[in-house]
């Protein structure tokens, strides 16, 4: 959840130049209002997924990609996400069962949303470091959705996309 303006500007540029259209924006909440103005209903409030899952309503999940719950992706995501949720439990009042309910609720929401929207790729500005971000990553891997991450090179003003699955860098003919 980087608050850097450059990541918002990159998404805005891709959208305005009809290179990419977000089907789900789950970015830093500092950009929420600006992103909502540009990307409309495709913008989700990150705090809802990380801290206030009770605000996720009307999932209307039937059985979209229910085989996810029997996959290695589910088991890996559950193990890692439940551990990531430990960081949110300041007072020790969040039981294992509570964590599993939250994890499965977010899973159902994401499976419904990603099955309906059928995105071409998951584009990340950074490696997932919250349970919600990591769950999106695992579900996209399960659905065979291309996952790319922006990388920067410290020695020069270089920004490039790299596939998380293959490590391949994408060549783009682009002048600044």
Give the residues covered by each predicted segment.
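Phosphate- and divalent-cation-binding pockets in alpha/beta enzyme and binding domains
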Residues: 9, 34, 135
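Charged, low-complexity surface patches
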Residues: 3, 103, 129
